[in-house]
Amino acid sequence: MIPAPPFLQATALTCERDGRMLFENLDLQVRTGDMLQVSGPNGSGKTSLLRLLCGLMQPTAGHVLLNGQPAGRQPTAPGLNLLWVGHASALKDLLTPLENLSWLCALHHPADADAIFNALDAVGLAGFEDVPCHTLSAGQQRRVALARLYLPGPPLWLLDEPFTALDRQGIAQLENHLAGHCEKGGMIIMTTHHTLSRLPAGYRDIDLGQWAA
């Protein structure tokens, strides 16, 4: 049987920032059920790689195909094929968690109010739906951003340090949710300094040191 083509494929990917080569000739493929953890020392280009893969940056050389199309040039609505959660929570401080998520869903994947309330409940923010985000703690703001992972959405998640500012309970819950997403056929590429305790069958580590210039 011929295997299905990869959902995401990077070929000979090279990244230069501020006159410094971070990595070059990087190849990777992501298929159903995969979880890729991008590792490497600070400054090795982990966040840059994620941004290249989702089309937020252009590579110095090489190319990225997402669901068969060049990343960042999707013929359909942005965000249809992947969900990006950066290391900053990227919330509008004066809006509430409900308003922030409603706005993000309107841009990418529409969700009704019940689904958003359920997502906030899943991350332990029931009762905080209508509180301005600037009044929330750093951990609570991070959970608002991560609530997007509990809403209907794309199969591929790109996550930059998703465990930042979470307490022990929040970390354990997120680990289980990420592994469950992959076990159900989803895909994840992420950076994290956290040592994962639950690894799906499709887990593998991508050490950027192998492609350092």
From Swiss-Prot:
Catalytic activity line of the entry: heme b(in) + ATP + H2O = heme b(out) + ADP + phosphate + H(+)
This protein's UniProt keywords: ATP-binding, Cell inner membrane, Cell membrane, Cytochrome c-type biogenesis, Membrane, Nucleotide-binding, Translocase, Transport
Protein name in UniProt: Cytochrome c biogenesis ATP-binding export protein CcmA
Subunit structure: The complex is composed of two ATP-binding proteins (CcmA) and two transmembrane proteins (CcmB).
Top enzyme class: translocase
One GO term (biological process): cytochrome complex assembly
The family this protein is said to belong to: Belongs to the ABC transporter superfamily. CcmA exporter (TC 3.A.1.107) family.
Originating species: Pseudomonas savastanoi pv. phaseolicola (strain 1448A / Race 6)
UniProt-listed Enzyme Commission number(s): 7.6.2.5
Signal peptide: none
Limits of the ABC transporter domain: 8-213
